[in-house]
Every structure is written in structure tokens, then in C-alpha cells.
């Protein structure tokens, strides 16, 4: 993507991954109500401009809606899966204060994030085998240098049980 437009750095992967707000699983929808003019909504405008892309990147399951110039004072509203609504007043707050406040009330804590990261690392370990949903490889035959699956390529006679049993039977006779 070309580096054109206002603050194209906002669209870089490094900038998007720097966001530190990962919502709890119960957050489903986030609405941002703000005004494009006025002194009191400056923090909300900067929040929308700089921080919403980071939140979208870190929380792809959350629907984010923006409402411009429809309210006298800027606020955020979160809809949870239990049907509850959380209202956050952002009038007179800076975009950093808004991010910190959201992270504190609806974000996952550091311990939970660390546990999830550790779990993800364990699941993606190359030595684990199982269904694709949980592991990188389904079978040992996918590893280079290993014997291929008998269903794909027949095994040599020396490696088959029937052949070995027949050899033993012939040797005993």
C-alpha cells in the first residue's frame, strides 16, 4: 500500500500491532459518538483518527460504528453479549486517557493476555500433531525425511507386519 494520505503510518502493520487494548470476549459492538468541530471533542477526534485502527486490528470480532455530529457531547458505548451497555464519557479527555480508561474497564488484563499467548505458543509448537484446528501438522508424514503415510505410498514389504509374520513362520518350518 502506498504511503499516501494523512498520516499513512497509521496503516502500517507495526503501528497497528502496537495497540494495547484487547477487549474481553463479552464485548461485541463499540459505538463512537463524536463531533467534528468544537474544543471539547478534540480527544475523541484524535482517538478515532489514531486509535480506532489499532483497536480494529487487535479486536477483529468487535463491530465498531462511528456516529459523527449527532450528539452534543462525545461518548463511547459498548454492547456486551449479555445485553448490557457500558457508556463511557470522553468529553475533555485526551486520546491516551480514553485508551487507558477503556483498557482498564473492558480490556483483558496483562495476566490473561500472557496466558493466551503462552497457550498459542504451545499449540503452534512444531512437535505437536493433531487436527488442523489445534496443531500445525496432522501427521508425522508431513515432516520432511519421515516415512510417508501408508495410505498415500505403500510401505516396503520389510516394514509390513504380515510380511514379517510370514518370514517368521517360514523360518520356523
Curated annotation (Swiss-Prot):
Keywords per UniProt: Disease variant, Mitochondrion, Primary mitochondrial disease, Ribonucleoprotein, Ribosomal protein
InterPro entries (UniProt xref): Ribosomal_mL43/mS25/NADH_DH, Ribosomal_mS25/mL61, Thioredoxin-like_sf
BP GO annotations: mitochondrial translation
Subcellular location field: Mitochondrion
Pfam families recorded: L51_S25_CI-B8
Superkingdom of the source species: Eukaryota
SUPFAM superfamilies assigned: Thioredoxin-like
A cellular component term, taken from the record's GO annotations: mitochondrial inner membrane
GO molecular function: structural constituent of ribosome
Disease as annotated in the protein's UniProt record: Combined oxidative phosphorylation deficiency 50: An autosomal recessive, mitochondrial encephalomyopathy characterized by intrauterine growth retardation, poor overall growth, delayed psychomotor development, hypotonia, muscle weakness, progressive loss of ambulation, and mitochondrial oxidative phosphorylation deficiency in patient tissues. Brain imaging shows partial agenesis of the corpus callosum.
Self-association state and partner proteins as the record states: Component of the mitochondrial small ribosomal subunit (mt-SSU). Mature mammalian 55S mitochondrial ribosomes consist of a small (28S) and a large (39S) subunit. The 28S small subunit contains a 12S ribosomal RNA (12S mt-rRNA) and 30 different proteins. The 39S large subunit contains a 16S rRNA (16S mt-rRNA), a copy of mitochondrial valine transfer RNA (mt-tRNA(Val)), which plays an integral structural role, and 52 different proteins.
Family: Belongs to the mitochondrion-specific ribosomal protein mS25 family.
Protein name: Small ribosomal subunit protein mS25
Native species: Homo sapiens
Amino acid at each position: 500500500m502506498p504511503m499516501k494520505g494523512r498520516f499513512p503510518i497509521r496503516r502500517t502493520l507495526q503501528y497497528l500491532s502496537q495497540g494495547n487494548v484487547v477487549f474481553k470476549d463479552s464485548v461485541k459492538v463499540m459505538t463512537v459518538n463524536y463531533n467534528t468541530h468544537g474544543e471539547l471533542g478534540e480527544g475523541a477526534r484524535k482517538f478515532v483518527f489514531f486509535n480506532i485502527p489499532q483497536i480494529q486490528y487487535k479486536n477483529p470480532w468487535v463491530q465498531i460504528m462511528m456516529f459523527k455530529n449527532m450528539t452534543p457531547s462525545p461518548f463511547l458505548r459498548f454492547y456486551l453479549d449479555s445485553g448490557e451497555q457500558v457508556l463511557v464519557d470522553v468529553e475533555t479527555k485526551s486520546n491516551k486517557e480514553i485508551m487507558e480508561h477503556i483498557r482498564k474497564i473492558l480490556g483483558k488484563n496483562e495476566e490473561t493476555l500472557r496466558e493466551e499467548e503462552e497457550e498459542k505458543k504451545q499449540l503452534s509448537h512444531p512437535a505437536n500433531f493433531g487436527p488442523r484446528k489445534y496443531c500445525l501438522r496432522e501427521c508425522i508424514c508431513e515432516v520432511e525425511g519421515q516415512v510417508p503415510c501408508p495410505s498415500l505410498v505403500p510401505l516396503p514389504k520389510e516394514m509390513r507386519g504380515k510380511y514379517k509374520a510370514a518370514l517368521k513362520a517360514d523360518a520356523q518350518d
